[in-house]
């Protein structure tokens, strides 16, 4: 007689084995109707799962994160079923759940079109309305191979052949469609009411470019139409804010096939980049970092000593000279240890904070490249802190405080914190790990922030904290990190003389705030839709004359503002003032200063913002004060200008 313990601690007893659905129905008809799956002793199962022993059970519905994932997985199967009904001969491969949706890869004789996508989605809606039961069955590996061979599903056969022979396999069927899957799935297709196909793209079998090309159809699915509508709205907003489109429109940068994954910065984009770099340089100087510069091309022997050659060789750009192998550095850390190693250090020299705007290159797969967000050539705001074990907490706390200040200046206030702790395979003693993990935890608690613990997710050489930004669309971008490293300093011979005159190996803290400049600038472009805070704007002020009579005044005003350190464009073209205002507004220049005869008479300017707000006429000195206050404020108030 199974006794079911529910999440609220209550118990329900049954005289005989029951399914998850039976339990939901016993609780209430509404819950039975809403049930998508169950969680039995922490494991997700179908609603048809039979419970024979005492069990802890949670009923999973569309309100649960697990429930939404199950809806997405089931919708992927629904899409595959629709594709095979509409396009006989289409072979299915894999169809996983991804963030906010799902995809399925197909092999078909021709590319799917937008018209095909509309037909597929319509057929999915029809199949969902049929409320087809979804059932689970078990087969042996040999039975499954025989079945899918008979069905002509070559790719499924290949997948099954890679599974150990003694393992029984689970399959899910709805109507005439059957697919290999661990599950669980919704009990019937009628549970799938809110989905949308979003795009079709190319893909390669097993993600290998040397294999045959497939077609990948992406979709999104949600528990209800309200959530779907909200997500599609966010997608539209993200499309409007796409940094690649805005970058092209504003003339910030471009990329081309002759240099895949590398950025061609244009003058305005480089101005933005330089402003970010100079700001970071000043912040690091203020917080006690010493800036260095290390080589970009380094011998294979150093990468072998550091351990990177064995682990990351395939991701490095390599070359050969005079019978020696070299690699363009994919990261800066081994080079920073070389700087530390020049001259014996004392405990009095620690902590030593070495920072570099390090130019790195990684041979990312071409299919993974995405504008500024995923590149092959990038610059990191990289720094390494060499310190004693007892200084870890203090250094981490100081870093977090600096990171908060920097993110606030860029306009980000919502930060997510994740602490990753020791994995099974690791270097260093448990005592050292205990001490380091406690130091990171105490540093987070000292800041009074909420943080998430990720047990076992640390690197083999030390625990870490990751810092992620949440943008205006609710998207999360992992940017900052601080990582304790017990391994590399020892591997590369770093030592210092301790206060007892013994030689010891320092702890090294890897840290970054922005991550890569390229990616962070991409995030800024999308966050502000190109309308950057005044301190970052490539052009901060456009000075516009109405007629040629104001030319000299405008030129002198522009020179005055330029000499005060502002980025100014004096637009003296023989164009109508309305045309010039519109053009600079579209270019998202924060302040438009208009000069006519009246302004000259009063040594004044008429000021407008890019949002169309008329700030009226004011003296040049007052405008400079307004401009200075706005620049000083940075991104700490997101009041748009």
Swiss-Prot record:
UniProt xrefs under CDD domains: TGS_ThrRS, ThrRS_anticodon, ThrRS_core
Family in the record: Belongs to the class-II aminoacyl-tRNA synthetase family.
Molecular function in Gene Ontology: ATP binding; metal ion binding; threonine-tRNA ligase activity; tRNA binding
Pfam families reported for this sequence: HGTP_anticodon, TGS, tRNA-synt_2b, tRNA_SAD
Source organism (scientific name): Marinobacter nauticus (strain ATCC 700491 / DSM 11845 / VT8)
Domain TGS: 1-61
Listed InterPro entries: aa-tRNA-synt_IIb, aa-tRNA-synth_II, aa-tRNA-synth_II/BPL/LPL, Anticodon-bd, Anticodon-bd_dom_sf, Beta-grasp_dom_sf, TGS, TGS-like
Catalysed reactions listed for this entry: tRNA(Thr) + L-threonine + ATP = L-threonyl-tRNA(Thr) + AMP + diphosphate + H(+)
Cofactor names: Zn(2+)
PROSITE patterns: AA_TRNA_LIGASE_II (PS50862), TGS (PS51880)
Gene: thrS
Protein location: Cytoplasm
Subunit structure: Homodimer.
Its job: Catalyzes the attachment of threonine to tRNA(Thr) in a two-step reaction: L-threonine is first activated by ATP to form Thr-AMP and then transferred to the acceptor end of tRNA(Thr). Also edits incorrectly charged L-seryl-tRNA(Thr).
Disulfide bonds: none
GO CC terms of this entry: cytosol
The name this protein goes by in its record: Threonine--tRNA ligase
Region of interest (Catalytic), ranges: 242-533
GO BP of this protein: threonyl-tRNA aminoacylation
Chain positions recorded as Zn(2+) binding sites: 333, 384, 510
Principal subcellular localization: cytoplasm
């Amino acid at each position: 007689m199974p006794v079911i313990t529910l999440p609220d601690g209550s118990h329900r007893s049954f005289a005989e084995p029951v399914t998850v659905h039976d339990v939901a129905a016993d609780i209430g008809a509404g819950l039975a109707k809403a049930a998508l799956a169950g969680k039995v002793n922490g494991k997700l199962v179908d609603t048809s799962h039979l419970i024979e022993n005492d069990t802890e059970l949670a009923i999973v519905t569309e309100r649960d994160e697990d429930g939404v994932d199950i809806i997405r997985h089931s919708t992927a199967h629904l899409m595959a079923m629709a594709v095979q009904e509409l396009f006989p001969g289409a072979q299915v491969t894999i169809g996983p759940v991804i963030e906010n949706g799902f995809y399925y890869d197909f092999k078909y004789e021709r590319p799917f079109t937008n018209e095909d996508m509309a037909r597929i989605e319509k057929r999915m809606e029809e199949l969902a309305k049929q409320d087809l039961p979804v059932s689970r069955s078990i087969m042996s590996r040999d039975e499954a191979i025989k079945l899918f061979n008979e069905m002509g599903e070559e790719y499924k056969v290949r997948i099954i052949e890679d599974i150990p022979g003694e393992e029984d396999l689970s399959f899910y069927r709805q109507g005439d469609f059957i697919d290999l899957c661990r599950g669980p799935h919704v009990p019937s297709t009628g549970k799938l009411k809110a989905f949308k196909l979003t795009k079709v793209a190319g893909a390669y079998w097993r993600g290998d470019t040397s294999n045959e090309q497939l077609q990948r159809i992406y979709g999104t699915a949600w528990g209800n139409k309200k959530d779907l509508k909200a997500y599609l709205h966010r997608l539209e907003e993200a499309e409007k804010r796409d940094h690649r489109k805005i970058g092209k429109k504003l003339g910030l940068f471009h990329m081309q096939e002759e240099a895949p994954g590398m950025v061609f910065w244009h003058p305005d984009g480089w101005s933005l980049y330089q402003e970010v770099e100079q700001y970071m340089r000043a912040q690091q100087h203020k917080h006690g970092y010493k800036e260095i510069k290390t080589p970009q091309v380094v011998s294979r022997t150093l990468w072998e000593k550091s351990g990177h050659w064995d682990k990351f060789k395939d991701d490095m750009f390599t070359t050969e000279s005079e019978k020696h192998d070299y690699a363009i550095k994919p990261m800066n850390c081994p080079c920073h240890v070389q700087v530390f190693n020049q001259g014996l250090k004392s405990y009095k020299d620690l902590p030593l904070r070495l920072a570099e705007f390090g130019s790195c290159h990684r041979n990312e797969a071409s299919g993974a490249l995405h504008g500024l967000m995923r590149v092959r050539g990038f610059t990191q705001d990289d720094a390494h802190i060499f310190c004693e074990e007892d200084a870890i907490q203090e250094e981490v706390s100081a870093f977090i405080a600096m990171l908060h200040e920097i993110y606030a200046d860029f306009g980000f206030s919502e930060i997510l914190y994740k602490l990753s702790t020791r994995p099974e395979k690791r270097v260093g003693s448990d005592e050292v790990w205990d001490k380091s993990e406690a130091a990171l935890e105490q540093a987070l608690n000292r800041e009074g922030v909420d943080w998430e613990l990720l047990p076992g997710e640390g690197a083999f050489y030390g625990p870490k904290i990751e810092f992620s930004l949440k943008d205006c669309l609710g998207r999360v971008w992992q940017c900052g990190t601080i990582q304790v490293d017990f391994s590399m300093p020892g591997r590369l011979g770093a030592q210092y003389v301790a206060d007892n005159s013994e030689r010891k190996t320092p702890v090294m803290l890897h840290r970054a705030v922005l991550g890569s400049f390229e990616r962070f600038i991409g995030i800024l472009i999308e966050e502000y839709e190109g309308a950057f805070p005044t301190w970052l704007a490539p052009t901060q002020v456009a000075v516009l004359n109405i007629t040629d009579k104001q030319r000299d005044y405008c030129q002198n005003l522009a020179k005055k503002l330029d000499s005060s350190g502002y980025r100014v464009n004096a637009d003296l073209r023989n164009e109508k003032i309305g045309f010039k205002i519109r053009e600079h507004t579209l270019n998202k220049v924060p302040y438009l200063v208009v000069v006519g005869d009246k302004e000259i008479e009063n040594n004044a300017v008429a000021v407008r913002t890019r949002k169309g707000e008329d700030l009226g006429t004011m003296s040049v000195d007052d405008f400079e004060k307004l401009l200075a206050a706005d620049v000083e404020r940075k991104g700490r108030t997101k009041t748009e200008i």
